[in-house]
Amino acid sequence: MAREDASVPRSHDSADASPNSTAKEIPVPQPPLLNLNLNLNMNSGFNLSNWWHQITSIEADSSDDRNNNNSNNGINAAESDSAQSQPIVVLGHSYQTTEEAHEDIIKKLCLTYRYGFERIPRAVNGPSPLSFMQSVIFSKSLLYNLQNFNNFIEKENFTTDVGWGCMIRTSQSLLANTFVRLLDKQSDIIALFNDTYLAPFSLHNFIRVASSSPLKVKPGEWFGPNAASLSIKRLCDGYYDNSTSETILPRINVLISESTDLYDSQIAQLLEPSTETKGLLVLLPVRLGIDSINSYYFSSLLHLLSLEQSVGIAGGKPSSSFYFFGYQDNSLIYMDPHSAQIFSSDIDMSTYYATRYQRVDIGKLDPSMLIGVFIRDLTSYENFKKSCLDAANKIVHFHATERSTVPESRRKNSEFVNINRSDLKDEDYINIDRVNRLDSTDDFIDLGDDYVETNTNLEEATPSAEDTVPVSTLSASESEITTSSYETPTSKDDNSSRASLDVVVLDTTGEQQE
């Protein structure tokens, strides 16, 4: 599967990014604007407060106009009567009216940008906090907090994630709403995400574990789905395995499947009833297209959101991430983390619920995203599997047993390997233990995995030297081997049912195959 490489710095998310969407407003009181002098007298010197108010008052006014135009539309403002008649689906629950859906949505946890949190030191050769000054300045939330402006920007420390932290925030939202299924008291859950190093699932600790991972993401660099999923797994594992932590949450396991393949035997092991495990969070960091989601996956993505096991999707637009938790017709409903709020060690729960939720047409989404599925037990898994199979879901694929002993994170599929007879054991793969047998071969060969022996009829003896064909030594006259990565089918008529396919083409003519 072709995926985004989270180790490559991405352009940073804007402070008020939003796809073409409508919004439903929940009235919240705003503090009064500071009483600033609007007359900028250049003879008396430049006044930052005056300049700031002039450039933001226009933006704030236009934003208010947009909000007023959209506030009455809400999530049910579909473009046609047929769309309006469609139910509203929110993480497995279906509602016939906007009011019913609204009551559910406002209970979802939403983590957003914060200002003034505990310092995160700038990494050597990492982005400078000053490079995000424009994003900070043009964030409307700062309009009400100019008195603290000097505390928001430092040269060597990050005290805000405005401009770069939205993927972390949406991943936190996904994880927090997973925990809601395990713990009733939401204030206890939010305490685990507070922006300090002491909180196990804070932005600070997301960065800490990602910076030490193979991805080596630095503070100020944009997270991708891969970095986000790896951070979630490492933080969850550390939370439960660290004996000094107060584990108020029941234990859950985390499984990352970049290939979107799920193996019954592996799931059963992770949900072993004899253990203290109370569930399994499955994370699927995927890329479902090139510039936008391929229409081939539309129905499958909506189907996943309709299941009771769904805990949402983090992703959305290029260089901006949103938390998607439902849909109506072909419009996905999401929360926007780009509205920054002031950090406080005393948690204000009202700042952790969405004050607005929006929608966007599925065809306008960025194809790179992180899909979350929470499975409570084996019965829940069987129900999830049956639903996906019945719906012919094209994103998730199920298998009885694991076919490889190599951890998925180590499968690079980027080097030549020796192919032995013991590597090829069923009818899906051809035997190429002799070069001269390639003369009539034009099939695809999967070189990505070291397969576990499953066919008891194969010879048990260790293959001899003549049975081993070092692929890297084959000459062009004998066989040309090329590798290709097919990200997605180019048409919904394509018969492929996989999100992506890594293949090796063996051409006996000596010509490279496209």
Curated annotation (Swiss-Prot):
Task: Point to the regions of Low complexity compositional bias.
Answer: 472-489
Q: Name one Pfam family in it.
A: Peptidase_C54
Record localization: Cytoplasm; Nucleus; Preautophagosomal structure
Q: What's the main place this protein lives?
A: cytoplasm
Q: Which residues form the active site?
A: C166 (nucleophile), D336, H338
Q: Name the Enzyme Commission number(s) assigned to this protein.
A: 3.4.22.-
Any one GO biological process: protein transport
Q: Which GO terms describe its molecular function?
A: cysteine-type endopeptidase activity; protein-phosphatidylethanolamide deconjugating activity
The answer to whether UniProt assigns keyword Nucleus to this entry is: yes
Going by the UniProt record, its keywords in alphabetical order are:
Autophagy, Cytoplasm, Hydrolase, Nucleus, Protease, Protein transport, Thiol protease, Transport
- From the UniProt record, list the reaction(s) this protein catalyses: [protein]-C-terminal L-amino acid-glycyl-phosphatidylethanolamide + H2O = [protein]-C-terminal L-amino acid-glycine + a 1,2-diacyl-sn-glycero-3-phosphoethanolamine
Compositional bias (Basic and acidic residues) at which positions? Answer: 1-15
Q: Which Gene Ontology cellular-component terms appear in the entry?
A: nucleus; phagophore assembly site
Map out region (Disordered) in residue numbers: 1-28, 61-84, 461-514
Q: What class of enzyme is it?
A: hydrolase
Query: Record's family?
Result: Belongs to the peptidase C54 family.
Provide the function of this protein.
Answer: Cysteine protease that plays a key role in cytoplasm to vacuole transport (Cvt) and autophagy by mediating both proteolytic activation and delipidation of ATG8. Required for selective autophagic degradation of the nucleus (nucleophagy) as well as for mitophagy which contributes to regulate mitochondrial quantity and quality by eliminating the mitochondria to a basal level to fulfill cellular energy requirements and preventing excess ROS production. The protease activity is required for proteolytic activation of ATG8: cleaves the C-terminal amino acid of ATG8 to reveal a C-terminal glycine.
Q: Which PANTHER family match?
A: CYSTEINE PROTEASE, CYSTEINE PROTEASE ATG4
State the name under which the record lists this protein: Probable cysteine protease ATG4
Q: What is the lineage of its organism?
A: Eukaryota, Fungi, Dikarya, Ascomycota, Saccharomycotina
Q: Which gene encodes it?
A: ATG4
